[in-house]
Amino acid sequence: MENIEKLLMQEKILMLELDLVRAKISLARANGSSQQGELSLHRETPEKEVAVHSALVTFTPTQVKAIPEQTAPGKESTNPLMASILPKDMNPVQTGTRLAVPSDFLRPHQGIPIPQKSELSSTVVPLRAESGIQHPHINYYVVYNGPHAGIYDDWGCTKAATNGVPGVAHKKFATITEARAAADAYTTRQQTDRLNFIPKGEAQLKPKSFAEALTSPPKQKAHWLTLGTKKPSSDPAPKEISFAPEITMDDFLYLYDLVRKFDGEGDDTMFTTDNEKISLFNFRKNANPQMVREAYAAGLIKTIYPSNNLQEIKYLPKKVKDAVKRFRTNCIKNTEKDIFLKIRSTIPVWTIQGLLHKPRQVIEIGVSKKVIPTESKAMESRIQIEDLTELAVKTGEQFIQSLLRLNDKKKIFVNMVEHDTLVYSKNIKETDSEDQRAIETFQQRVISGNLLGFHCPAICHFIMKTVEKEGGAYKCHHCDKGKAIVQDASADEGTTDKSGPPPTRSIVEKEDVPNTSSKQVD
């Protein structure tokens, strides 16, 4: 009978809880539908909650029994044969839902405050904290002098404006204000025009050659017409333009004047060897490879002392560069030793149509000791276009002398031989037959009156005197033919033939180019 009362009381409690849950469901459904319905629901639910609360408070069982005695000490568990639904077991209600307090029904959402929505402005949008956002930083570069002086905001444009032009000063700044202040201070000291700001899209292309970079004036900006001409969307981006393979007469004259007037100030990567008529470059480590390339094409180099990575000669002809690399790896034990390239060369020859003759080179490669540069002196440069042929004859004679001296050297290794270039180095062994044959073939092909690309009687006369000193003989059918014509004309006119070589500016005959033969060391 006692168990039935407990079960009935538990049933009432559960029914009250069920009513309470239903009231909460109705409250949730009616929330927001209408204010009147919500107020009525609030007036009804407190009564039910009070009933549930009073039932829980006034509930007392008719009889309370203590825990039966246990057979062993320390065991406080109940007897499994007796009911365990006692008042002490029913202190908390056996449900997962929290009992509502009457005050909760007076506050919506069970007393949890709802934050008020802030009114968003239609024009002002809240910004995020920018402490963690990294914005790209733009540097500014000031090119103080040179043909493309100005203020740039792109390193690629700055590099194109300064690469290959020695003596150009440039510096990086973090802001445009600092760059403008530095540029204005420089132009004020130098009393030159104010430097313009050149954005990335408006940078002009780099000049084609080293000589043009220093001689050509800066290009003026084009002024677009407002009527009749459509302005393009953007100017072309700067590019890296390779050097032209053929050197022009203007480039040669500029380089000739540059090396003649160089006094050694401001550039420690080169020094000069000065003679009466011509001066030659001597390039040291970290020299400008583009300048080395153009001086090589002009025949104005005496010696090159490259770095271990050979960056100074990277623009020389590929076969010459490969021969130098093979020398470092195959011919010397310590590949970290410094080397040198000693060059004997002719100079180019031009006609009205353009380049007639490219320089011929004999290059010796060897291990370099300590470089002691000679003092560079500023020499007078009064060469004219009319003097180029005479200068070409002079360098041609010196080239022939250097080539014939190879016959006196008994230990030579030929690294590379082509139609116009011979590269050799010293050897610990005697010159073998293959290398000797390569040298003789190159001498027979090059040593002639057509050395400079045209038949030059002065060259023939020099070869004849040089060979006669060695006990040999030299004949040129062009000179014999011209001599016979002169003798016939003298006999008819009653004049005598003048002795000595004919003038160098005789009729230019195109050089007969023989087949190219090459020898490379694997």
Curated annotation (Swiss-Prot):
Compartment list: Host cytoplasm
Major localization listed first in the record, in broad terms: host cell
Keyword line: Host cytoplasm, Translation regulation
SUPFAM superfamilies documented for this protein: L9 N-domain-like
InterPro entries attached to this UniProt entry: Ribosomal_bL9/RNase_H1_N, RNase_H1_N, RNase_H1_N_sf
A biological process from GO: regulation of translation
Gene3D superfamilies xref list: Ribonuclease H1, N-terminal domain
Domain of life: Viruses
Note: The inclusion bodies are the site of viral DNA synthesis, virion assembly and accumulation in the infected cell.
Family: Belongs to the caulimoviridae viroplasmin family.
Protein name: Transactivator/viroplasmin protein
